[in-house]
Amino acid sequence: MLEALYAAGPAPDRARQMMLYGRFVGSWEGRFVYHAPDGVLREAPSEVHFGWALEGRAVQDVWIVPSRHARQDPNVSTPGILYGTTLRVYDPRSDLWHITWIDPLRQDYDRMTGRKVGDDIVQEFRTEDGTRCQWLFTEITPSSFHWIRRESKDDGKTWNVRVEFFFQRKATESERSGRSVTL
């Protein structure tokens, strides 16, 4: 099944557009910050892994909080906060991304659309109660990004940040060993 899901790169007929999310392909580690309604910040180590899928017509990822490494630490008492996957598919007809998030741990399922806005990526959806939600990829560099989930009860006039991730790209095995890689 994994062999059928995996793709080595983007589909040639949409390779340029696929790089909006394709630039994240690889493994990342960082910090998860939850902004509780009472104003208290809760933090945990986190990881995310992006890869090409479905003949290069999708980018799929897996988000894990706390990270698998942190779960091995006997001093970490945080239970699993999330362990889910996102499937992102580019639609050339609308020039939008159709995105589905699934977290079986929390029984959380979100469908949204995504697009490039300036230097950022904005994904939007509404919850069952009508709350407008955005997931933002911002401060994007080849080796880091900042991810924000924010919500608005007044259709975007004011926003409340609920979750943030601060990620750094993990070094590949060849980078860790000092070997150079020719592409």
Residue ranges and their predicted role:
Residues 1-183:
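Hydrophobic small-molecule pocket/channel-lining residues, especially in calycin-type beta-barrels
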